[in-house]
Amino acid sequence: MQKTSELDDLIKVIQELPASGRKIIAVAGAPASGKSTIAETLCDKMNEMKPECANILPMDGFHYDDVLLKARGIHSLKGAPHTFDVLGFAHMLKRLVARNEDEVVTPVFDRSIEIARAGSNPISKDVKYIIVEGNYLLINQHPWSELKAYFDLSIFVDVPVAILEERLRQRWVEHGLDEKGIARKLQEVDLPNGAFIAANSSTPDITFEMNS
């Protein structure tokens, strides 16, 4: 397992992947680890080097809808592993790896309203690199463990718990939660999920270290 804190190192490894076929790069990490920002930055830099060669598939686009979560009595746990359509996510990866459709339209997650939006991001057949980002990509338990077969490169974003908690707190402040609501989110959802990820993720190809 390689360790780095430089984005240029990640780009170099991606560029050194075998030239043939489409490449799926997984960027995993705890809530608020910065994985989405890293995925977006990697995508932007790669597209600067070669236009439209990269795109992003966010795991959060496969959140179950709030209506379904409420009907099942698990809305308060939104973000936990069992609140995602994992098999739908795996099927989407299978389609993208097959690369036999001119275009695959994928869902995204609108963080401003905490809702997944279907049919939002078209990925052309010509796109070579798809950066998949999400919390549970490397989890070694079924059904999440089925995803690993689709990844050509896996990256885990490693951030100290104290920094994660600070970022998460700020996130929920920006969403208008009061102190009681923030404490519940942190103690019942985000921090337990982060601990679960740390304890149950398979070894990545690269650990990206962020200490600030």
Task: Show the residue positions of the predicted features.
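Hydrophobic positions on the alpha1 helix immediately C-terminal to the Walker A/P-loop
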Residues: 38
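Conserved lysine of the Walker
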Residues: 35
